[in-house]
Amino acid sequence: MSFKDLGVSKWLLEALAAMKIRSPTSIQAECIPQILAGRDCIGGAKTGSGKTIAFAAPMMTKWSEDPFGIYGLVLTPTRELALQIAEQFLALGASMNIKVAVVVGGEDMVKQALEIQKSPHFIIATPGRLADHILNSGDDTVGGLKRIKFLVLDEADRLLSNSFGSDLERCFKILPDASKRQTLLFTATVTDAVRALKDKPVPEGKKPVFIHEIVSKDQVAIPATLTISYVFVPSYVKEAYLHNILVSPKYEKASAIVFVNRTYTAEILRRTLRKLDIRVASLHSEMPQSERTNSLHRFRAGAARVLIATDVASRGLDIPNVELVVNQDIPADPDDYIHRVGRTARAGKKGGSVSIVSEKDVERILAIENHINKKMDLLEEVNDDKIIKESLSIVTAAKRESVADMEKEGFGEKRKINKRKREERTRDSKKRK
């Protein structure tokens, strides 16, 4: 089957061919014709499945038949994923002079408002920043959203979690009713929130929702080419163990992502490893967007061998050739573990994952093993004597210096200031009402 067989526009066929995308993946072959037929869609979207084209191709095909106003809105949980999706839209639509606006945090709101006012064909946004514009930028700016034809929730399982609830509600209020638009959800796992949407009554005049390969929790699997292991350590020496793993003969040249749960931890580790002469970059929410983008570019290009990241890097991002994933902090949700380790062992390649487990993490590890139906192996490359001899003293000294530097610089103050500003804007908006 070809993209032509799926009903994609001729100009888009040429764009796909220019990008050397010639044959549709399973999710593309099944979803594209159904979306073109006017159906809402819930699609299973494993890493590397080609899900962006699965929704972008039919949206852009229908847009080219009636290119008027803001045609589609794509909501996604992270800034980096929004930028990546926008790049694909622009590449696909270059021959048609497509206009795409990226509306994410960390960028100038006034500049964004002016872009939205120009009615770009597609808006790619994070819910929080779009909600800010709806609340504060006025109907002249966001009024075009009332007439969109498509709404896409990418990484829908995460977007429909409690952390995005209030922002999504504000975004949905300005959009056309569900009966007057197509809604496309792409998700890696079926949460209760996604399942509830799947089972909702179909609005009058609409076709039944199309479902593609939804993976239930009891079918969760990790790649066969991925080795998963752990080390069990006291919490106060976790950084020393991390350093020893990264400089061990097995991993000293490996491209690695180290996942943590907090921005503060990410910054400490970045500074500590840099002092220990490891080429390192970081990615977390307290970094300015320009620095976040630069970190990703450096890691992709190999200028940084190690990326320290919170879960903003765990989903959807196209980062090829990651050989090792380290869980410096163990995630509370087993699905987050799956997304993290899914950054390696992609497309049949081999990859490794190491979880650094302390006494407080045991229940989380057991929950993960139960979820993936597989036991982790003990990592043999590190042992207590080796850590004490090679890493503990130098890592402790580097960490102490890093913490002192962060205190001098007032790390974390920007987040507090931004939080106060958001609270003030919300109060002002309520007063105006």
UniProtKB/Swiss-Prot annotation:
Enzyme Commission number: 3.6.4.13
GO MF term set: ATP binding; ATP hydrolysis activity; RNA binding; RNA helicase activity
Record field: compositional bias (Basic and acidic residues): 401-427
Stretch list, region Disordered: 401-433
Binding site for ATP: A45, K46, T47, G48, S49, G50, K51, T52
Enzyme kind, highest EC tier: hydrolase
Locus of motif DEAD box: 154-157
Principal location class: nucleus
Domain Helicase ATP-binding: from-to ranges: 32-208
Motif (Q motif): 1-29
InterPro entries named among the record's database cross-references: DEAD/DEAH_box_helicase_dom, DEAD_box_RNA_helicase, Helicase_ATP-bd, Helicase_C-like, P-loop_NTPase, RNA-helicase_DEAD-box_CS, RNA_helicase_DEAD_Q_motif
Localization per record: Nucleus, Nucleolus
Keywords from the named record: ATP-binding, Helicase, Hydrolase, Nucleotide-binding, Nucleus, Ribosome biogenesis, RNA-binding, rRNA processing
Reaction equations catalysed: ATP + H2O = ADP + phosphate + H(+)
PROSITE patterns: DEAD_ATP_HELICASE, HELICASE_ATP_BIND_1, HELICASE_CTER, Q_MOTIF
Coiled coil segments of this chain: none
Source superkingdom: Eukaryota
Domain Helicase C-terminal: 247-387
Entry function: ATP-binding RNA helicase involved in 40S ribosomal subunit biogenesis and is required for the normal formation of 18S rRNAs through pre-rRNA processing at A0, A1 and A2 sites. Required for vegetative growth.
Similarity comment: family membership: Belongs to the DEAD box helicase family. DDX49/DBP8 subfamily.
The protein, known as: ATP-dependent RNA helicase DBP8
